[in-house]
Amino acid sequence: MHKYHLNSPYLPKGDQPKAISELVYGVNQGKQYQTLLGATGTGKTFTIANVIEQTGRPTLVLAHNKTLAAQLCNELREFFPKNAVEYFISYYDYYQPEAYVPVSDTYIAKTSSVNEEIDMLRHSATRSLFERRDVIVVASISCIYGLGIPSEYLKASVKFQLGNDINVRESLRELVSNQYVRNDVDISRGNFRIKGDVLEIGPAYEDRLVRIELFGDEVEAIRYVDPITGEILENLNSINIYPAKHFVTPKDRLLIAIQSIQKELKDQLDFFNQEGKLLEAQRLEQRTKYDIEMLKEVGYCNGVENYARHLSGRDQGTPPECLIDYFPEDWLLVVDESHVTCSQLQAMYNGDQSRKKVLIDHGFRLPSAADNRPLKSDEFWSKAKQTVFISATPGDWECEVSTDGIVEQVIRPTGVLDPVVEVRPTAGQIDDLLDEIRKRVIKKERVLITTLTKRMAEDLSDYLSENRVKVRYLHSEIHSIERIEIIQDLRVGEYDVLVGVNLLREGLDLPEVSLVVILDADKEGFLRAKRSLIQTIGRAARHVDGFALLYADNLTESMSTAIQETERRRAIQQAYNQKHGIIPKPAGKKPSNSILSFLELSRKLQNEGDNADLVSITSKAVDSLNQSEDLGIAFVELPEIIDKLEGKMNLAAEELDFEQAAKLRDRIRQLRKKLSKPE
């Protein structure tokens, strides 16, 4: 049996041993909810890693965004190099859901772009859950969406055992039914080929090939081989080849599903005709009958997920099976930054249903399409038997359900104290801010600035840039992978200041940041609530000289609470340091590029040639034209960038995405202006 082996040069320090002991005891005693109330930089991830090792449970770590999930996955992979630490997020690089706008009679078809590498990591996660117990899956909130039927996925796997006889034709037929594609020329993930007595398969969950060597019908050898060099990497006694897609429907169930779809179609057509909705009836009949024919002929159709209830044999209103259902009964849930993540669960379901209702009412989809949905909040929590919430500022609900299971962790192993907090008036704040930034730049330290609006962030970034400050603006339109690159660039000193709105709060591990600035700190609201302020102040808590500067003309209740909590923690930390003779020292984390290497982006960009250029160049141009000099876009590259952007603009127009096309047009105009003003 596989066991967890925690790899760390450090032993638990400060109040980590007490927190670990209490959480492990709670899990072993069967407590349903516990909360780790840990200040920023106190090593909450290390504490949880110890809890996972000591309890030995398969664990789902839930994060509220892809960036944080990637960071957590990196840290846990370093702690558990010999165990299965998997990454499970949405595999869409781009996703436009199907929608209908009745006011303008506009139908928007679903369009998406799947990231093959992330799809591979998702398959790797489910494979690990079937084959071992020492599994940690770090997932975003997308894990609450339907993911096939675990039992059918497992049943459909094709097993090869050394020395066994196989029916080669039947094995090939099974691979095809599991949505593998035969390709005797180019073997890659999701493909297979057979030449003589050698069968090679590109599993959906591996970047290695599986080679099955036969002697007649007998399996003579099973090997992992390098897809490029053909080098033998590992010899195996047996292997399961899992389906290339998570949604697997056996033929007998497919026939039953088609009959069920036809019955629902008849009922809905009768309803529309009775209501006098002849256009809706005609639209629904035409679309659904076409989908049924596709299902009969090839077992698949566009938008097949809308028939998920029929294909899985579920009753109306019952929850879909998702990643959670791939875990064994005694799994453990860890919710990171729980004050944000928990509230997301309900929002996901509500947003999905409002869009689906419009499609159903206007005859674009059958009513059963509404059951292709994420889990409701109560459905999710009914599946989670034991949960540990992690947050520096847990929400009211987490505290309420963890009545006898709240564990506080305030002491940092490095001895670093919470930041000093100072409130200054807004008069002359920009000049004062510029002075503070220059002090940090001289010492090669970094600065985070949070504003209330996007416009304020843009204007401030422009002003700082004009004053020769190396600054970058982080905004919501930047893709999650590029966000990781931006944060990485801040750490290594490509620029000194990062400006944002609400993207600078949770889970950003930035030991180089010594100053956090909060503008308009007295403007009450979500972005200036007590939890948001505590989280933002905490971004400077990893630096020995951490300092939080709040510009405000009034002291609000939220500000007062945040300052008092920071001072309370600081006092506890100072007392502990004095008692044990600890001198604060900076965190030893290197600004490595491990997140990016984990996602294998560099390899992907190198291999994709022109497409990679399009991604890497145009993403910079589209997202940050006003700062193109800071991004290293050379003047000689501008014509090529403009050409590629025009291609993207035309593509967006062809897909009727006129809003995106207009944005690209405006950005092309800006680039042309830059082109007309040579350096």
Curated annotation (Swiss-Prot):
GO terms assigned for molecular function: ATP binding; ATP hydrolysis activity; DNA binding; excinuclease ABC activity; helicase activity
InterPro entries cross-referenced by the UniProt entry: Helicase/UvrB_N, Helicase_ATP-bd, Helicase_C-like, P-loop_NTPase, UVR_dom, UVR_dom_sf, UvrB, UvrB_inter
Domain Helicase C-terminal: 429-591
Ranges where the Helicase ATP-binding domain occurs: 25-176
GO biological process: nucleotide-excision repair; SOS response
Comment text on domains: The beta-hairpin motif is involved in DNA binding.
PANTHER family registered for this protein in UniProt: UVRABC SYSTEM PROTEIN B
Function (record text): The UvrABC repair system catalyzes the recognition and processing of DNA lesions. A damage recognition complex composed of 2 UvrA and 2 UvrB subunits scans DNA for abnormalities. Upon binding of the UvrA(2)B(2) complex to a putative damaged site, the DNA wraps around one UvrB monomer. DNA wrap is dependent on ATP binding by UvrB and probably causes local melting of the DNA helix, facilitating insertion of UvrB beta-hairpin between the DNA strands. Then UvrB probes one DNA strand for the presence of a lesion.
Designated name of the protein: UvrABC system protein B
Annotated gene: uvrB
